[in-house]
Amino acid sequence: MKELGCGAVVFPVDYTAPEELIEAYAGAAKKAGLVIAEVGAWCNPVAPAETERRAAMERCIGQLKLADKIGANCCVNIAGSTGSRWDGAYKENFSEEHWEKTVKSIREIIDAAAPVNTYYTIEPMPWMVPKDPEEYERLIAAVDRERFAVHMDLANWITSPEKYFNNEDFMEKRFDKLGSHIKSCHIKDVCLQAEFTFQLKETACGEGILNLEKYARLADRVNPQMPMIIEHLHSDDEYLESIAYLKARLEKAGVRMCN
């Protein structure tokens, strides 16, 4: 990864992996000078089905303990949904009951794992808590745990024409509001589709409208070692192309690019 100009990685195995494999990956990252940006939980700790919910809570606690053990910047998940699809859009996702369950689940995960070297974070989503930066501030206050922080995915918050076309102003205000809490970032792009009605598509970096140079500068201002993780591409070749593109684009703009 260092040869590609990268300075951060996502941890490739979960807490159920053999201890020697976990230690080997963590040791390799440390030897190469790579920041372990995040350990993903990616499950639904507020699932309506009790069996799924219990399994998800167990996984979140295990993943947070793993992140703490290996010194990752954070363990990241989404809040979870009220329906059968773990990351799905449902009306009830905006209910007070769902808010209360989200706060309770985050507290229980952090209290059970008791991290001291890392943070539990929620990746924002367009259709669940936290749906906007103001709600993320409310969530931080409601959870009231020192080891709860922010995972920044700016593209997921571009949900209107105003935010889309004024993305530079939007991202600056978001970093001003949440910057001190941010532990890791996803970097990608967003493109408005021509078809009616209003449709936004997540794209690879450079295929949308976001000012990625400004995004990287704002992240760097918060933390010069802030991980910026590319995601949701379909092959190794696509990732290599995206890394090369982003590195060239940011270097041309005079923006540090080591992640």
Feature annotation, model-predicted:
Residues M1, A29, A56, A67, ...:
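Conserved, mostly hydrophobic/aromatic
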